[in-house]
C-alpha cells in the first residue's frame, strides 16, 4: 500500500523530504514548486528551483502556478485525486480550496517547536533569540499561519556556535525522516493530532535588510547570536575602512571572548571586538565580491590593529 501524494516545496530544504517519500514507495502524483526565476551571472537565465530539478530527475510531473487564484488551477489540483498534500517550504499561501483539495488534507513540515516561531524565518529567529533547542514538526495545515494541530515532533539542539546554515541542514534531514514517519502513520490511520498551546506564541518575521547590520553596543551574547543567526544568508555585516574608504564586510562566524573597551573597537589585532558588555571574536568574514575567509587570512590582507573602530 502507498499514498497518492502531491508534494509542494521549492528550496534545497524541501528536497530530502521529496526523496524520502519516493524512497518510501509513495506515489507522487504531482510536484508543485515556485516558477523558474531569473538567475545566472547576468540574471538573464531562468533557473528552476532545486525541487523542480530533482522532480524532473525523478520523472515526476511538475507544476509551477504563480498562485491559486484561477479556478482552473484549483480544479487541476483536485483532479489529481490525491490522498494528501505534503508541504515543505513551498513559498505560497494556500487557499481553503487547496487545503481541502485532497482526501486527507495538507501536512506541513515546519522548522520550529510550535507555537514558538510561527512564520517565515523560524531557523534564523531561533538562533538570534539564543534558543538552546528547536526542531521539526509535522502539522495538519489550516487557514491560520502555522496554527494547525501537530502530529509529530523531532527536537534538535542548537549548539552555542551553530550558524543558521548548519541548523538548516540538521533540520532539513530531521524533517525528511519525520515526514516519512508521519506518512506511514497516516497511511495506517495512526497519526495523532494535538492542538497547539495558546501560550508561548511567537512569530518569526521575515529577515529585513535593515536589521542585518551588527550593533556592537549590544551585549556580546546578542551580537554573537545575531551573527550566527544570519549566517550564511543574508549575512550580518559591519563597516570598516579599507584602502581609505568605508566598505561593508560580512561576518559569517564568531565566538564569545573576554575583554572590555569602547563598543565596536578592536581589542587586539586578531579581530576581538568590544561590545556593550564583554566581547566577540570574529572568526570568518567575507568582503564584498570576495570569498569567505578565516580571520587569520582576512587580517593578513587587511590588518585591523587594536583600537580600530568597526561598525
Swiss-Prot record:
Listed binding positions for (6S)-5,6,7,8-tetrahydrofolate are 112-115
- A molecular function (GO) term: methionyl-tRNA formyltransferase activity
Entries under InterPro entries matching the protein: Fmt, Formyl_trans_C, Formyl_transf_N, Formyl_transf_N_sf, Formyl_transferase-like_C_sf, GART_AS, Met-tRNA-FMT_C, Met-tRNA-FMT_N
Provide the E.C. number(s) assigned to this enzyme. 2.1.2.9
Q: What class of enzyme is it?
A: transferase
Instruction: Please indicate if the UniProt record lists Chaperone as a keyword.
Output: no
Q: Which reaction does it catalyse?
A: L-methionyl-tRNA(fMet) + (6R)-10-formyltetrahydrofolate = N-formyl-L-methionyl-tRNA(fMet) + (6S)-5,6,7,8-tetrahydrofolate + H(+)
- What S-S linkages are listed for this chain? none
* Alphabetic keyword roster: Protein biosynthesis, Transferase
Which GO cellular component terms are attached?
A: cytosol
Q: Which CDD domains match?
A: FMT_core_Met-tRNA-FMT_N, Met_tRNA_FMT_C
Domain of life from the UniProt record = Bacteria
Q: What job does the chain carry out?
A: Attaches a formyl group to the free amino group of methionyl-tRNA(fMet). The formyl group appears to play a dual role in the initiator identity of N-formylmethionyl-tRNA by promoting its recognition by IF2 and preventing the misappropriation of this tRNA by the elongation apparatus.
> Of which family is this protein a member?
Belongs to the Fmt family.
The UniProt entry, under PANTHER family, shows:
METHIONYL-TRNA FORMYLTRANSFERASE (PTHR11138), METHIONYL-TRNA FORMYLTRANSFERASE, MITOCHONDRIAL (PTHR11138:SF5)
Any idea what this protein is called?
Methionyl-tRNA formyltransferase
User: Which species is the source of this protein?
Assistant: Agrobacterium fabrum (strain C58 / ATCC 33970) (Agrobacterium tumefaciens (strain C58))
Tell me what gene encodes this: fmt
Amino acid at each position: 500500500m502507498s499514498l497518492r501524494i502531491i508534494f509542494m516545496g521549492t528550496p534545497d530544504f524541501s528536497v530530502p523530504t521529496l526523496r524520502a517519500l519516493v524512497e518510501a514507495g509513495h506515489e507522487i502524483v504531482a510536484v508543485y514548486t515556485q516558477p523558474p526565476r531569473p538567475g545566472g551571472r547576468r540574471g538573464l537565465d531562468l533557473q528552476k528551483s532545486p525541487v523542480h530539478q530533482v522532480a524532473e530527475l525523478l520523472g515526476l510531473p511538475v507544476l509551477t502556478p504563480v498562485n491559486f487564484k484561477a479556478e482552473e488551477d484549483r480544479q487541476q489540483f483536485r483532479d489529481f485525486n490525491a490522498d494528501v498534500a505534503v508541504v515543505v517550504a513551498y513559498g505560497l499561501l494556500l487557499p481553503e480550496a487547496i487545503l481541502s483539495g485532497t482526501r486527507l488534507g495538507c501536512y506541513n513540515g515546519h522548522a520550529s517547536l510550535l507555537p514558538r516561531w510561527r512564520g517565515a524565518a523560524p531557523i534564523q529567529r531561533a538562533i538570534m533569540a539564543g534558543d538552546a533547542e528547536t526542531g521539526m514538526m509535522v502539522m495538519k495545515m489550516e487557514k491560520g499561519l502555522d496554527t494547525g494541530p501537530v502530529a509529530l515532533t523531532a527536537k534538535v539542539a542548537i549548539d552555542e556556535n551553530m550558524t543558521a546554515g548548519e541548523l538548516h541542514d540538521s533540520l532539513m534531514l530531521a524533517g525528511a525522516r519525520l515526514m516519512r514517519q508521519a506518512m506511514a502513520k497516516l497511511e495506517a490511520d495512526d497519526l495523532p493530532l494535538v492542538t497547539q498551546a495558546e501560550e508561548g506564541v511567537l512569530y518569526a518575521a521575515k529577515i529585513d535588510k535593515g536589521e542585518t547590520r551588527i550593533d556592537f553596543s549590544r551585549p556580546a551574547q546578542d551580537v554573537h547570536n545575531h551573527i550566527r543567526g544570519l549566517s550564511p544568508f543574508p549575512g550580518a555585516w559591519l563597516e570598516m575602512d579599507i584602502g581609505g574608504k568605508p566598505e561593508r564586510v560580512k561576518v559569517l562566524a564568531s565566538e564569545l571572548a573576554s575583554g572590555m573597551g569602547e563598543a565596536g573597537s578592536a581589542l587586539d589585532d586578531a579581530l576581538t571586538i568590544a561590545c556593550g558588555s564583554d566581547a566577540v571574536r570574529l572568526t570568518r568574514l567575507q568582503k564584498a565580491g570576495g570569498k569567505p575567509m578565516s580571520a587569520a587570512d582576512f587580517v593578513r590582507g587587511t590588518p585591523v590593529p587594536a583600537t580600530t573602530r568597526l561598525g
